[in-house]
């Protein structure tokens, strides 16, 4: 159970609770056990109003407490505690973390293999069948779930969470407060090959990938995402970057601080993406280009050249009835003949 007082402390890491001083001692002691939407929440749950579309549900909510803006706080039922904040959705994000399920295992599992030269910090959890290579360093309070592999000479910062089946290649550097979800691969060999005179007969000459992957602090990487090591220079992921599931980041890519990347996006080698960019799902970005700061790419956009001006860019074709699409395709081909 989490008290209102504890919720306030968590929220105020990001923004103030504007009516904190007006809450009674009894209200501050109120305990909650979870989060629900305005319609379904019960007396032991917290809810929030982030979108005015759901305002009609506020008056009849049974939630024990509601995160609300100043504009709408008078519409909260009298028996529900109103926590007034500037951005309810951000407050909801903050408190969701303390309601999340905690790790059930702590310590080092007896089946884990840890090289003698590895340096393991204080209060580190290492799950079953993990493999920790030579000269690896793992920071304090980090958690490795089952079957994680960390190859030689890799460093992981403090307070990391590494889910099952993650593989981190040799010589990589992972910052603090990083979350790597199941099946993530960091530091795989980049896709680098030189053609021979006749690849169909003599094949392709493999280029050894000699760089590393460097990941900053407060980074979140979703399941089954692959980030390849650099060919010569490093692949670099900045601070506060969030990456969804099933994203491919090729060798030598550099991603700026605070950028968000949705699922199924592919970023080809040696491309640089600036700070605070938002990249939608299934975006394709060609190699050896630069994208400036504060660029938004809508879903399925194909980027084939550098973007030097901040703003929103799109290239995907929206769905339409098939007959209409066929007529539009004919006209599009005709435009190419002009």
UniProtKB/Swiss-Prot annotation:
What biological function has been recorded for the protein in this entry?
Answer: Catalyzes the N-acylation of UDP-3-O-acylglucosamine using 3-hydroxyacyl-ACP as the acyl donor. Is involved in the biosynthesis of lipid A, a phosphorylated glycolipid that anchors the lipopolysaccharide to the outer membrane of the cell.
Which CDD domains does the entry link to?
LbH_LpxD
GO MF: N-acyltransferase activity
Q: What EC class is this?
A: transferase
* Name listed for the protein in its UniProt record: UDP-3-O-acylglucosamine N-acyltransferase
NCBIfam families, A to Z: lipid_A_lpxD, PRK00892.1
Q: Reaction(s) catalyzed by this protein? A: a UDP-3-O-[(3R)-3-hydroxyacyl]-alpha-D-glucosamine + a (3R)-hydroxyacyl-[ACP] = a UDP-2-N,3-O-bis[(3R)-3-hydroxyacyl]-alpha-D-glucosamine + holo-[ACP] + H(+)
GO BP annotations of the record are:
lipid A biosynthetic process
Q: What gene is this protein translated from?
A: lpxD
One Pfam family assigned to this protein is LpxD
| Annotated metabolic or biological route of this protein | Bacterial outer membrane biogenesis; LPS lipid A biosynthesis
- Indicate the residues that form the catalytic site: 251
